[in-house]
């Protein structure tokens, strides 16, 4: 496909984006808004931003959800801006500096919350800054400006949603159904690989792919939940399927690890059974029926616990899968599965990374303020706004530097494009609303196609072009003002990029170490006799951390294997029949406290000391288990855990 070619699948969204822009423009001028540009810009960003993130036409509900987040972020930002202005109106410089800190604070929060919700916090940060900067000449008009900005943004969002509904958005339901079938086949094939006990790298690749696919399925569930309330039953089932899929991965990998020391546990009966190849979900269904008969014939005691647990989880997965596809009423058997254990939320491992993002945003905004005050440039305020926008939105993404480059390319492309609209097109179409709408629709259509291709600079060009062309009421054409705005955008993006380069993010290794220690803490916390604690479902949170580790350290197999081993240890110890008595319960609490100290330690020396203490406590704990005559189901996994921690103690403690 050529660089300027138009694929059929891109046309519908391009028309949708053009419609959203035209609707926002028409409504803005019809209701005599002072700056219809904000409504048009909001409609374009909400629609195009979702498509850029999806790499194509977004699924149904995605634009609506992003618009909802934008409304929340705008209202939080407006309220914060009003509070800052009321409190510090007599000290303008201090007021702007506090706004810079507020933008950094919002970026810090957005780095810690779920990535889907981070958009609202990033927006709240720079909205307050926009209000404070814009009202500098006339501070008494602050409430009016805040209300107008909120109104224009809500109009833009409503227009984007209307355009999305008008062109029948894609439903993700069929994709979910297909992925459920395919994922079950992949789970069976992983178990086959693990029972064969072949090449470790092949097994690593297989389970790594399944972790990514299960995480992607969880993302699809979020999209389906946003799409319509009629998928509420499917959403409940998919939430349980996520845990079941992770359980299948864990049991398969434990089957592989067990054979490293005790290959005789997997009998020839099961080896021969899993030799049969499967291609479709129907093949898996037949094999599972046969496997349940084999287990009933051999007996539960003669069946390896990992295979028995795997079959139970696969059977539940199959039952819920049928319910998701048909979206029928939840029956009693399904309800029993869905009334599972409560999921545990873990503390973010990216706190240091979040603090780096805070300083990047705060320092870049302060640098913009100093540049504005030093030069006295009329568009210094525009440069400040772009600095806040770039740093607030870029920091949460995996590669902030590339986001800043995208904005630089976009603002550079917006200069000639905006010049064409400012000097030629808009002056010749302002007498006709129809011609003005057509001219902006053409802009939205072609940039909408490029946005779906994730063309570098396309998203920045769309937003920057709309921002600098005259879409005010009434329209005024001052070339110096246009040029100042265009150059202000470019300078702001360059300054933001400079700060991102200068303030290095060296938090990757620290985040990796914290993640690994959180896996250790989870495995230690599984050693408990507390019934409520044993019922807690840590699996989704643990695999979410594993997925983050895989993204932070692509290709680092030793780290992935260590993390997976800790997850397996957690699951095995969680189900182990630990003797119930006060002596062991008190020691469990002591080990949990020590594991927490390992995570929270700020220096390598403290971390090594607490980790050494944890290893000593594990030795004492094993002795206590022997005294209390704990069965092998308890002593063996504890011994394996202690051995793993001894082996990898340097990786878990040293910076």
Curated annotation (Swiss-Prot):
GO terms for biological process: carboxylic acid transport. GO terms for molecular function: transmembrane transporter activity. GO terms for cellular component: plasma membrane. Induction: Positively coregulated with aaeA and aaeX by AaeR. Keywords: Cell inner membrane, Cell membrane, Membrane, Transmembrane, Transmembrane helix, Transport. Pfam families: FUSC. The keyword Cell inner membrane applies. Belongs to the aromatic acid exporter ArAE (TC 2.A.85) family. This is p-hydroxybenzoic acid efflux pump subunit AaeB.
